[in-house]
């Protein structure tokens, strides 16, 4: 297959991960032209094509070198990796970045009226799941014999339909489990979205673009975790006020025009400034205290 000159990125076609992936790309300056039913979207300002596919297909597209980058949940990635390796098939990829969205957990659940005494409670039970490889690894690590009921959807109805004794499924709030008379008893895997790259080396202009995008992504993620703090402080209380500020970095101190007794303090913090701290700052004489979100950062 001929090498495409444009960077090809695979993302989930629909759902929450799709929206978050598009929002991330747009936040780093990738302008996209997307039509709802189209499987391919194009960037209008960068040489990037976006392939919108089923999330289960993304790892394989990376393993096989069909696309250059993929944004996918760690749970889907590792399930596909384990499946490939069980068949001695290629499952090579490069993990570029774990992202700050798409969080979920893979959990074991039982009917609410079941007695649970630890993982041993699953011994010899039939467990319905869409993640047989992750379940198998966990059960083997804990030496628990079990049987699998493989389902690709509606896993939570398996016990009430007498298809299985329990389930292993993704959980976010737990509301779906409760609605189906189930209780979450153990988390076996925690997942977030991540960016992966195909293992084969890329032409230089593609790799340079990926490196640039990663720098921007790091900046956006760092900005989300940071706050810009500004305040005015009396010089005589400067040491006490500085000690109250969160983080390890020292603030920038600027003189105030027409006020020789006070200075302005500016700083970026990756820790929250709680109300109690703001009240303590005010008690020490600080004023005009502002805590602002940061949209973009380059460190």
UniProtKB/Swiss-Prot annotation:
GO cellular component terms listed in the entry, alphabetical order: cytoplasm
Entry cofactors: Mg(2+)
Gene3D superfamilies: 3.30.70.120, Periplasmic binding protein-like II (3.40.190.10)
Assigned EC number: 2.4.2.17
Record-annotated disulphide pairs: none
Keyword field: Amino-acid biosynthesis, ATP-binding, Cytoplasm, Glycosyltransferase, Histidine biosynthesis, Magnesium, Metal-binding, Nucleotide-binding, Transferase
Protein name per its UniProtKB record: ATP phosphoribosyltransferase
Biological or metabolic pathway of the protein: Amino-acid biosynthesis; L-histidine biosynthesis; L-histidine from 5-phospho-alpha-D-ribose 1-diphosphate: step 1/9
Role noted for this protein: Catalyzes the condensation of ATP and 5-phosphoribose 1-diphosphate to form N'-(5'-phosphoribosyl)-ATP (PR-ATP). Has a crucial role in the pathway because the rate of histidine biosynthesis seems to be controlled primarily by regulation of HisG enzymatic activity.
Catalytic reactions on record: 1-(5-phospho-beta-D-ribosyl)-ATP + diphosphate = 5-phospho-alpha-D-ribose 1-diphosphate + ATP
Places the protein is found: Cytoplasm
Family: Belongs to the ATP phosphoribosyltransferase family. Long subfamily.
Keyword Nucleotide-binding attached: yes
Source organism: Campylobacter lari (strain RM2100 / D67 / ATCC BAA-1060)
Regulation: Feedback inhibited by histidine.
GO molecular function list: ATP binding; ATP phosphoribosyltransferase activity; magnesium ion binding
The keyword Cytoplasm appears for this protein: yes
One GO term (biological process): L-histidine biosynthetic process
């Amino acid at each position: 297959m001929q090498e495409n000159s444009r960077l090809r990125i695979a993302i989930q076609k629909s759902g929450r991960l799709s929206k978050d992936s598009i929002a991330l790309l747009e936040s780093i300056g990738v302008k996209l032209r997307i039509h709802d039913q189209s499987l391919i979207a194009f960037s209008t300002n960068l040489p990037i094509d976006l392939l919108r596919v089923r999330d289960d297909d993304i790892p394989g597209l990376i393993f096989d070198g069909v696309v250059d980058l993929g944004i996918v949940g760690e749970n889907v990635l590792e399930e596909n990796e384990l499946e490939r390796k069980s068949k001695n098939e290629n499952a090579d990829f490069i993990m570029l970045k774990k992202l700050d969205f798409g969080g979920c957990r893979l959990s074991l659940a039982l009917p609410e009226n079941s007695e649970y005494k630890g993982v041993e409670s699953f011994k010899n039970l039939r467990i319905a799941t869409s993640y047989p490889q992750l379940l198998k690894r966990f059960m083997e690590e804990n030496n628990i014999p079990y049987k699998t009921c493989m389902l690709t959807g509606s896993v939570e109805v398996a016990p009430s339909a007498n298809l299985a004794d329990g389930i292993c499924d993704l959980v976010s709030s737990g509301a779906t489990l409760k609605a189906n008379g189930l209780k979450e008893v153990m988390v076996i895997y925690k997942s977030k979205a991540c960016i992966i790259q195909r293992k084969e080396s890329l032409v230089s202009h593609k790799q340079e673009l990926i490196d640039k995008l990663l720098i921007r992504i790091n900046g956006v993620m760092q900005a989300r975790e940071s706050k810009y703090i500004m305040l005015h402080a009396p010089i005589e209380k400067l040491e006490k006020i500085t000690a109250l500020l969160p983080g390890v970095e020292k603030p920038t101190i600027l003189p105030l025009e027409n006020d020789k007794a006070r200075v302005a303090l500016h700083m970026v913090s990756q820790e929250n400034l709680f109300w109690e701290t703001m009240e303590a700052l005010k008690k020490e004489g600080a004023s005009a205290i502002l805590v602002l979100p940061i949209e973009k950062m380059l460190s």
